[in-house]
Amino acid sequence: MDCKVVSLNEKDQFIPKIKSSDPVITGLFQYDAAQQTSFEKRMSKENNGREAALANVIREYMSDLKLSSEQELNIQHLANGSKVVIGGQQAGLFGGPLYTFHKIFSIITLSKELTDTHKQQVVPVFWIAGEDHDFDEVNHTFVYNENHGSLHKVKYHTMEMPETTVSRYYPDKAELKQTLKTMFIHMKETVHTQGLLEICDRIIDQYDSWTDMFKALLHETFKAYGVLFIDAQFEPLRKMEAPMFKKILKKHQLLDDAFRATQQRTQNQGLNAMIQTDTNVHLFLHDENMRQLVSYDGKHFKLNKTDKTYIKEEIINIAENQPELFSNNVVTRPLMEEWLFNTVAFVGGPSEIKYWAELKDVFELFDVEMPIVMPRLRITYLNDRIEKLLSKYNIPLEKVLVDGVEGERSKFIREQASHQFIEKVEGMIEQQRRLNKDLLDEVAGNQNNINLVNKNNEIHIQQYDYLLKRYLLNIERENDISMKQFREIQETLHPMGGLQERIWNLLQILNDFGTDVFKPSTYPPLSYTFDHIIIKP
């Protein structure tokens, strides 16, 4: 497999500004992610004393998996005080978008580089956001159908949308297998298809909860790298979190004030507010099989779905004795994660790192230092066919990744058309506009006639526009094969107006290139970069 790094002219300059140590952006974080001294400081930080307990919890969580020797070793390293590089993601259908796997590769790559540079073992940890309850965000994925030249949405259907956390949801296995079958129908059959289908079927048969199936697929893909997994909703982990839940409940108003103040500062720097929440407690409580947002009305803590209320002593007692009923929101999850782990760096997507920029004062309030916040690696897969099509139409890869192919497609259509025809129609449009101006001069002061002339002009311009559009549409139809090829480039490299990794699913890559494509023996060694990585299997 070939690997190269390209620099894109990104519309969103947040990550490029992190790369260049822009003082406005770096001021939002505890550490400058582009400076080596930041890593030296983090590596030398004293541990929090929770590493041995965490290692036991992670071992228990992964006990239903057959651990690799690398994972066994990393659990031992963690127990002995090794620091971690960490990141997380929701449990998407069949693994969800490719960026989930690229985030894990980011964690693997950075932890290895830190281990090699500092001669201290750094452990890669992936945090599964099983506490989330928005099932609509994880119950679907997309698949590219080569025969149709288009993307198809594949969705797991359920009679009732679960309101509990994803970790507490147990999908119907028959329906899930039907969803899997639908996905494979759209994918082309390769020498890898049958083996991949068997792996997926086995995972569905062997595991019951939504997140356990997700975990098993990740484990199948990354066990050789020694990645450790933990679900935020895992009950033994929640018991470890009880002291912090109590602190959050006791300081909830100060926490909310700190968050709002930091968010306002980011907006004062010209950034849009990323975290949208009305709560002033920033925790959820599981009650009546629903994950319910907690708020405080000045007297009581109140649940948003059942209107159940608690006085302060009651809700703190729940945190003490039943912490598994609590879960974090977008504000408190990073805080809890860093309170638990001895983290060198947190790896996040473009939106996630902007969330973290709004939390600096929250960390300071709880005397928890924000780790280095690193943008994850961004990766696109380029196959031989797409590479040949880019060459055929002389389209720069970097341009497609940023803008898609619509501009190049329109240019191609016009190149196939009669230049004289287009020029004459455009000339007629310009002539009509000049005529309209002259006519308006003739009827100046008479509003009825002005309206008449403008309406007449509008009709003529519409007719000329229609003529030109229909003519170009005919040219487009005459070049149907090329249009399909442009669409193929678009759906592969810039699907739905964004990067491939935001839409394409892991199974598509495994089906095309083999179930061992992500294994250390096959996947190219990566170096951490803020730029874009192109991998050609």
Curated annotation (Swiss-Prot):
Record key words, sorted: Coiled coil, Ligase
Recorded GO MF terms: ligase activity
InterPro entries, A to Z: Bacillithiol_biosynth_BshC, CC_BshC, Rossmann-like_BshC
Enzyme class: ligase
Transmembrane feature ranges: none
One Pfam family from the record: CC_BshC
EC number: 6.-.-.-
Ligase as UniProt keyword: yes
Coiled-coil ranges per UniProt: 422-450
Function recorded in the entry: Involved in bacillithiol (BSH) biosynthesis. May catalyze the last step of the pathway, the addition of cysteine to glucosamine malate (GlcN-Mal) to generate BSH.
Family according to the record: Belongs to the BshC family.
Protein name according to UniProt: Putative cysteine ligase BshC
Species assigned in the record: Staphylococcus aureus (strain COL)
